[in-house]
Amino acid sequence: MASLAQQLAGGLRCPPLSNSNLSKPFSPKHTLKPRFSPIVSAVAVSNAQTRERQKLKQLFEDAYERCRNAPMEGVSFTIDDFHTALDKYDFNSEMGSRVKGTVFCTDANGALVDITAKSSAYLPLAEACIYRIKNVEEAGIIPGVREEFVIIGENEADDSLILSLRQIQYELAWERCRQLQAEDVVVKGKIVGANKGGVVALVEGLRGFVPFSQISSKSSAEELLEKEIPLKFVEVDEEQSRLVMSNRKAMADSQAQLGIGSVVTGTVQSLKPYGAFIDIGGINGLLHVSQISHDRVSDIATVLQPGDTLKVMILSHDRERGRVSLSTKKLEPTPGDMIRNPKLVFEKAEEMAQTFRQRIAQAEAMARADMLRFQPESGLTLSSDGILGPLTSDLPAEGLDLSVVPPAVES
């Protein structure tokens, strides 16, 4: 047996254990799971969410700083540069200034307009047209339309501008009326109202006043309402918003063109058992049933209808009463053509009228020769276009009544 010293020098060694459970590794039958308190778990989740929020916040802040300070790809300036340029943009938003814009949205109350400003502008329905309309589409205001507008206000709620087309149209209407006055032109005006001094006529979108003293007919204001009458401008004053017109001046010019024997174009206004009323440039003339054709006309409606356009000859003109007698009978190349072929009558109207005036001139020459036997100093007058003048001072200034002249061809 080795000595104790030898054992200590060689190291102590334990004898091998017997084949028992103690010689095997420890392996518990049940694994123990760690247990955490609910409070500790909740704190851990909360800390994780906080860290995630802080991380996202930092990402957003970094991205914003890059947008502010770092030039973007393809863009040579920063966001600050953009805001500076926008502030310096020369956009005139003063009241009364004009801007061009494109309509991009409409509704029952108006339209939204892109005028390349910081916000869209608004065009109210009442400012979309010089005439009364029910919706902006009636004035041609639809998405995609580009127009020039005038700034008339600002919406305090969102600082958007309020636009008008009507004011521009009014300016153009006044300019047009001044031009028509300078040219002394006869225009048509629709009677839309009346007061104790006269009637109100709508001309070029403006409301003109026509004093009763400047109305040639004896019609009342109620009878003239909604009718169109010829007018001339007497006063056009945009500053005072005064537009005064005269029906008498217009009628005088129109009547000067109504020479006896001349051919004019007219429109059938209405039919009566005794004839048809024809509008010849603002003056109503009567085409008597006996002057429609050489053939008998039993029903005028078989020959004419309201709205028909036709050529007629002036037979007589009573300026005092404002009555004009017309004829298509005198224009028939062959008796009955007005019933069978009215188109031919209108095509030959000038030719037939010229022939008719030549026959009148011959009759006048014969009458002059007869009168010279008794009144050598007197005579007939005939204008270059064949319009008859007075034979003596007792005859009407407008000349002879040609309704009694026999037809060129006997029926």
Curated annotation (Swiss-Prot):
Its main location: plastid. One of its GO terms (cellular component) is ribonucleoprotein complex. Residues 96-166, 184-248, 261-329 form the S1 motif domain. One of its GO terms (molecular function) is structural constituent of ribosome. One of its GO terms (biological process) is translation. SMART domains: S1. Gene3D superfamilies: Nucleic acid-binding proteins (2.40.50.140). Component of the chloroplast ribosome (chloro-ribosome), a dedicated translation machinery responsible for the synthesis of chloroplast genome-encoded proteins, including proteins of the transcription and translation machinery and components of the photosynthetic apparatus. Actively engaged in the initiation complex formation via a strong mRNA-binding activity. Possesses a poly(A)-binding activity which might play a role as a control element in chloroplast mRNA translation. Two different forms exist, S1 alpha and S1 beta. This is Small ribosomal subunit protein bS1c. It comes from Spinacia oleracea (Spinach).
